């Protein structure tokens, strides 16, 4: 296992690689994760490409349970990846042949791969491979909460999820408890873009923001 301390450079810098190389490393990543046995699901650019809008991505974002992140990183190291405990409270990295995988175990709003999210994980095709992908509702909430000046693409990824996915609005509202103000702001933004957002969902989020309870 080749582990590097926090904030190391070199192998963990994101670089443009060819599609063939990217997919080869993806296959190796998935094989190592499946051999380890801990549940995982893809988020980030791969999930957005599957369920929303295709866009270029330089890395792979995979979510694991917080208490299994260390074992997952060790398994990737044993499989030949260079590994890094980048931010020990939420993010590790693994790299191979100039392709970086972000191993995320805590997202903005204290979102983690809990039982509710795991129960909704989907198997979807990506570039000829069947991968576990988080549900579009979970991805949308994560995109809404992680939006910043440096990552405006996250909300545009979210717009594509509203436009292209048949969302379970009741489930989305339950997951919105991690950041109801951000999710409400995003859904109002989606309306300005001409997308259909149920009025009941907006009312429920306004109530959640105001009172801490969802509308009946």
Spell out what each predicted region is.
Residues 1-216:
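Compositionally biased terminal segments of proteins
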